[in-house]
Amino acid sequence: MLQYMSCRDAAERWNISQRRVSVLCAENRIQGVAMLGNMWIIPITAEKPVDARKNNGTKPVVEKAHPFVKWAGGKTQLLDVLKCNLPSGIGTSITKYAEPFVGGGAFLFSLLEDYRFEEIYISDNNKELMNVYQMIRDNCVELLYALDILQNEYNGLSIELQERFYYEKREEFNTIELTEGTSVRKASLFIFLNKSCFNGLYRVNKKGKYNVPFGKHKSISICDGENLTKISAMLQNVEIKSCDYHDVVRFADSSTLVYFDPPYRPLNVTSGFTSYTENDFSDKDQIELAEFYKELSSKGAKVMLSNSDPKNTNENDNFFDDLYADFNISRVEASRMINSKGSSRGKIKELLIKNF
């Protein structure tokens, strides 16, 4: 009878971390590995996999944590600019970090790679997205197992069957109610749909149902064990909320850095990708957010906010210049990453507004 060992046993035998063993299991790097309940079991005869992170005897290539989904308004292209604009005092006078509208988390992950905060708060009005964050934090191994199954099933199909498979999973995602018992399944479907849909969009109709069409990808890679495990470790002490951005007022104080990355004000009728939830973000909402920005500023919090620059299309549009007249407004160059017309992607100016 074949005997098995736990990840802990394998870690001791191979002189690597238990977390690394879990990643190798999730990536199918260990022959004969299986899932029992919510834990991996490994054949006692299994050999330690060759470390693919090493390159010809040089130092291991260590990739930084990066977003697990493609997200409209993602800040990957702006990370250097954002970091150059951080306030002084992080780690001393600034010990807390808050990010409502966290989205894909590019800035969050980059920030946590370089800085340590005593308390961290993230939120978003998209309950499905925040469920994924919670599952990565609390049930990463189960999530990786579910993603591995979806990835293998999809990649083994013809393009015609992949399309049918996509719409079956989209229907399942829209049908399942988000409960404790379905949280992992919904999170895995969320990531699958994001990576196999058209252009990486998240869009819902007026009934709140996800309605992005099939993206015709011949293969997908959604079971990134190393990245998700790294993110899981980062999120262990993070407060994760699915709520309106106003909730952060209870968390923010004079020792807090708050970064707002709300749905951008569209530059024209066709450029708005604000339907991440069933509620659009109007000019009235932008004005309300500006008032809240001022409220947090009056509490002593250090506040940064990104948004579109209307002067890209109308030099006389002073909407944000007037709203944030009392604060520091910078115009920075960014890349448009998601657009319904791929040919219209390119460089564009964005606003970065700070109270310091």
Model-inferred region functions:
Residues 82, 97-111, 122-126, 191, ...:
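Conserved proline-anchored active-site loop of SAM-dependent methyltransferases
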Residues 58-96, 106:
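S-adenosyl-L-methionine
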Residues 323-356:
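Class I S-adenosyl-L-methionine
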Residues 7, 30-56:
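Short helix-start
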Residues 114-236, 274:
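Class I S-adenosyl-L-methionine-dependent methyltransferase module
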Residues 1-20:
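Polyanion-binding surface elements
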Residues 209-218, 264-285:
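Mobile active-site "lid"/loop adjacent to the S-adenosyl-L-methionine
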Residues 286-335:
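Conserved Class I SAM-dependent methyltransferase catalytic core
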